[in-house]
Structure formats: structure tokens, C-alpha cells
């Protein structure tokens, strides 16, 4: 009896230690108030590991950096928690219809918009590249609606982030290692998510085959509905009983019909002979008495929904900006201006040109770098740039260097003419996802010769590696 008592006490102590460890783990993950994980689906537990690993590291470093990066990280964290709630729902409930599914995804979609809007509202931020990296890739949270290839979709978003994280690395690699660690932590979220999707949701979000149809998100850290699916809707009322009289009538009519059919040719004996004076095409007088001929019923067409025309929302015009903010020249929202000039520049200053339309800008002196973003029909003339000139998300841009520039980068741009000076003939032209690019080389007579930048390539496997060459289209 004493041995049994000792065994019970040892078991109780062991259980107590396990509960303490479990509680500490939950507190560490920040989900102590979330539903119990004892019965959580394996892919929910795996997602929790992702939250406790790279996500927690990203949040920690973002908090150390502070400012806009920390605020942005908190928004990302909210989006990930909403995604976890959807995973809990999917693990317990069946997939709803398409229109209901969009309602379930709405909170995640709204959070994605909030993250993107934060970047747009803080274009003057000193940490704008950090915000852009997050904003360009946060749509990866939408993988839950992507089928049958959610994994490649996340990779595409991750690649979009790297365009800006490379800038962060270039700016901080010799200045502050904390920002380098931030880049590694943030990108690891999406690489880990790709591995997670490959293991649990290869062709799309895996829904439960049993349980009620999902109606709302469950598994949120707080809220009365956390951890359980909504109760199933009540069954539809039974159809009204069919009248026995109508049943007997239909049965009798059907029997009569088959009886007449079974008569064979003898059924024609009951038909009356129609003489010529009874035929309308033989007797015009009878045709005149018969009145207008009725047309048959029109084929069914679904009624068009009557929608009241919604008034067009007046787009708010942003104020034009031309100012020096710290070490950044901001040129924004300029339209139909042909004489903009920036003078008194310094080597450490940069220029950011955003949303300018049909505008010409001249930058005098030597400057660190120039970025042209989301501009149309922009003419840019500058003297010297020691770093890089970047053209992003723009259309019909003309750039002329009077002095020297080492690199011109063209990304997601349709129509770009780069006029080089004699001192810039060794300039590197780097392009991606762009079209109608031309480089103009000066001649001895003062004119320019135009050379198109290749847009079409051919790639072959030579047995050891891929070899890519330019493909020329024969005209």
C-alpha cells in the first residue's frame, strides 16, 4: 500500500513539472491566452513554432531599432496572428463556399492593406527601405487563398522584398550590424513559411473533412469564440406534404396517356378530317376572322440587376513638394513643370523623385544617389552621381548625365532613354522587368547614336550549367 502511495505522489509531481514547463513555454511564445494547444492540429503547432522562431526574432530586433520599423513589425505580427486564427479554423471546420471564404479572409486582407498604407504614409521616413521591404512582401500572407501553388507565391513575394533589403544591407553593413540581423530575421520568416507550406499545404490551405462549415475565425488570442467553430446552422424545414389527390390525379393521367399510346395505329381513327374550308391558308375569310396570331413565349433571360451608379470618388491631389529634408531632396507630385532646378548640392545628399508627371528636373553639382519612383514622362538632367541612379515603377523616362555616373538601374519601367556623356561610357546599365529601354551614346558631332537594351533572352543547359544569351528578333 505504501509503495502504491509513493508511486501516486511521484506521478503527481511529474505531472506538475510538465504543466509548469508547458505554461512557461506558452508564456514565452506570447500565446498564453490562446486556445489550448493540446488538441491543436499538427500544422497549427508547426505554425506556432514559426511564430516562436523567426517571427519572434524579427519582432525583437524591430523593437531594438524602434520608430517606424517597430510600429510596422507590430502590424505584421497582427497579420500573422490573424493567419494563425484562420489555420485553427481550417483545422476544425470544413471549407465554406467561395463567397463565405472571402469573408473569412477579409481580416487578413485588411491587415495587409494597413501594412502597405503605413509605408505610403511614411515616405519621408529615414527607414523607408525597411518599410518598403515589408510592404512589398506582406502580401505573402495571402497564400491561404492561393491554389494550387501557394509556395511559389510566397517565394515571389520574398524576392520582391530582397530588392529593398539589399539596399538596407548596402547602407548598414559597415555601420550597424543590427539592421543586417533585421534583414536576416525578416527574410527567414518567408523562407520558413515556404518550407511550412511545402510540408502541410502543398496545393493550398488544408481544411478539415469533418466538423461544421467555417463561418468565422476561431483561435484568436482573445474573444469569446476562440478555439471553437460556430455551431452548425439548423436544418432546413421539411418540404410541405404532397397532396394525395394531386398524386392520384397525376398517376391516372399518366396511365391514360400510356393506354392511348399502346393503341398503335388505331388511335388515328378518332381524329376528325379537316376540309379545305376549315384551313386558314385555303380560306382567306377564315384567316381574317382569326385575329392576330399569338407569338410563342420569349426565351428566358435572367433579369439584369438594377444598380445605381456609384458616384466617382474625387481623388485627393497631393501637394507638390520640392524641399531638402535632412540629407534627402524630396521632389514629389510635380505636374507639368518644366524648369525645376536643384542647386547647392552636397556629396552626402540623395534625391528621391516620386509621382512626377510631364516634368523636367535638373540637379546641379555632385550628389550621392538619385531614385525615380512612379513617374511618367519625366526628364531628368544631372551632373555627377557617385552612387547609383535608380528608375522604378515608371513610364517614359528620359535621363541625361552631363558628368559621370557608375550605375543606372532600371526596374519595372516601360520606356527609358539614358543619355550618357563621354565621361560615363563605362556606366553599368542594370535592368529587370522593364521594356523599351535605350542607351544613347554621344558622337563626335554632338549627336547621339541610339542602342536598344536587350529584352529577350535564350537559356540553354550545356551539361554543367545554364547559359543565357541575348536573342535578336529578325525583322
Swiss-Prot record:
List of residues that carry Phosphoserine: 34, 290, 295, 301, 308, 310
Example GO BP: cAMP-mediated signaling
Site of covalent link Glycyl lysine isopeptide (Lys-Gly) (interchain with G-Cter in SUMO1): 348
Residues bearing the modification Phosphothreonine: 307
Protein name as catalogued: Adenylyl cyclase-associated protein 1
Gene Ontology MF terms: actin binding; adenylate cyclase binding
Membrane topology of the entry: Peripheral membrane protein
Record keyword Membrane present: yes
Domain annotation C-CAP/cofactor C-like: ranges: 319-453
Modified residues (N-acetylalanine): 2
Keywords assigned: Acetylation, Actin-binding, Cell membrane, Isopeptide bond, Membrane, Methylation, Phosphoprotein, Ubl conjugation
Organism this protein belongs to: Homo sapiens
Positions carrying N6-acetyllysine: 81
PROSITE patterns in alphabetical order: C_CAP_COFACTOR_C, CAP_1, CAP_2
Region (Disordered): 216-237, 278-319
Description of how the protein assembles with itself and partners: Homodimer. Binds actin monomers.
Cross-referenced InterPro entries: Adenylate_cyclase-assoc_CAP, Adenylate_cyclase-assoc_CAP_C, Adenylate_cyclase-assoc_CAP_N, C-CAP_CF_C-like, CAP/MinC_C, CAP_C_sf, CAP_CS_C, CAP_CS_N
Reported function: Directly regulates filament dynamics and has been implicated in a number of complex developmental and morphological processes, including mRNA localization and the establishment of cell polarity.
Keyword Cell cycle applies: no
Any Pfam family matching the protein: CAP_N
Gene name tied to this protein: CAP1
Low complexity: compositionally biased ranges: 218-228
Annotated localization: Cell membrane
Residue list for modification N6-methyllysine: 287
UniProt family annotation: Belongs to the CAP family.
Amino acid at each position: 500500500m505504501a509503495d502504491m502511495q509513493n508511486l501516486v505522489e511521484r506521478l503527481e509531481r511529474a505531472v506538475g513539472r510538465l504543466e509548469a514547463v508547458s505554461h512557461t513555454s506558452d508564456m514565452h511564445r506570447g500565446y498564453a491566452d490562446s486556445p489550448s494547444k493540446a488538441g491543436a492540429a499538427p500544422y497549427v503547432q508547426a505554425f506556432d513554432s514559426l511564430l516562436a522562431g523567426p517571427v519572434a526574432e524579427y519582432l525583437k530586433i524591430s523593437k531594438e531599432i524602434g520608430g517606424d520599423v517597430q510600429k510596422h513589425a507590430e502590424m505584421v505580427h497582427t497579420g500573422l496572428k490573424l493567419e494563425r486564427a484562420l489555420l485553427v479554423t481550417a483545422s476544425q471546420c470544413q471549407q465554406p463556399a467561395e463567397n463565405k471564404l472571402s469573408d473569412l479572409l477579409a481580416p487578413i486582407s485588411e491587415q495587409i492593406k494597413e501594412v502597405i498604407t503605413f509605408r505610403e504614409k511614411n515616405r519621408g521616413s529615414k527607414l523607408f527601405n525597411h518599410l518598403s521591404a515589408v510592404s512589398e512582401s506582406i502580401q505573402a500572407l495571402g497564400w491561404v487563398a492561393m491554389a494550387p501553388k501557394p509556395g511559389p507565391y510566397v517565394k515571389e513575394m520574398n524576392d520582391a522584398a530582397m530588392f529593398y533589403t539589399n539596399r538596407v544591407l548596402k547602407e548598414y553593413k559597415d555601420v550597424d550590424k543590427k539592421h543586417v540581423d533585421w534583414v536576416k530575421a525578416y527574410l527567414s520568416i518567408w523562407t520558413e513559411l515556404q518550407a511550412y507550406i511545402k510540408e502541410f499545404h502543398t496545393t493550398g490551405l488544408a481544411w478539415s473533412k469533418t466538423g461544421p462549415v467555417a463561418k468565422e475565425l476561431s483561435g484568436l488570442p482573445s474573444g469569446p469564440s476562440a478555439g471553437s467553430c460556430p455551431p452548425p446552422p439548423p436544418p432546413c424545414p421539411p418540404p410541405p406534404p404532397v397532396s394525395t389527390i394531386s398524386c392520384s390525379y397525376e398517376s391516372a393521367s399518366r396511365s391514360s396517356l400510356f393506354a392511348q399510346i399502346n393503341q398503335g395505329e388505331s388511335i388515328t381513327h378518332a381524329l376528325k378530317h379537316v376540309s379545305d374550308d376549315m384551313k386558314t391558308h385555303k380560306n382567306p375569310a377564315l384567316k381574317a376572322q382569326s385575329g392576330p396570331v399569338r407569338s410563342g413565349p420569349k426565351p428566358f433571360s435572367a433579369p439584369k440587376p438594377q444598380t445605381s451608379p456609384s458616384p466617382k470618388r474625387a481623388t485627393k491631389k497631393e501637394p507638390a513638394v520640392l524641399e531638402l529634408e535632412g540629407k534627402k531632396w524630396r521632389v514629389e507630385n510635380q505636374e507639368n513643370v518644366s524648369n525645376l532646378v536643384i542647386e547647392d548640392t552636397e556629396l552626402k545628399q540623395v534625391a528621391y523623385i516620386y509621382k512626377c508627371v510631364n516634368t523636367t528636373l535638373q540637379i546641379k553639382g555632385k550628389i550621392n544617389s538619385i531614385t525615380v519612383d512612379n513617374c511618367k514622362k519625366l526628364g531628368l538632367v544631372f551632373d555627377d552621381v557617385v552612387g547609383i541612379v535608380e528608375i522604378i515603377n515608371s513610364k517614359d523616362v528620359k535621363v541625361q548625365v552631363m558628368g559621370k555616373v557608375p550605375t543606372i538601374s532600371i526596374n519595372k519601367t516601360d520606356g527609358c532613354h539614358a543619355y550618357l556623356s563621354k565621361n560615363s561610357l563605362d556606366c553599368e546599365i542594370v535592368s529587370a522587368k522593364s521594356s523599351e529601354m535605350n542607351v544613347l551614346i554621344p558622337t563626335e558631332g554632338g549627336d547621339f547614336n541610339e542602342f536598344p537594351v536587350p529584352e529577350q533572352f535564350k537559356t540553354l543547359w550545356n551539361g554543367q550549367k545554364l547559359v543565357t544569351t541575348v536573342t535578336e528578333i529578325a525583322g
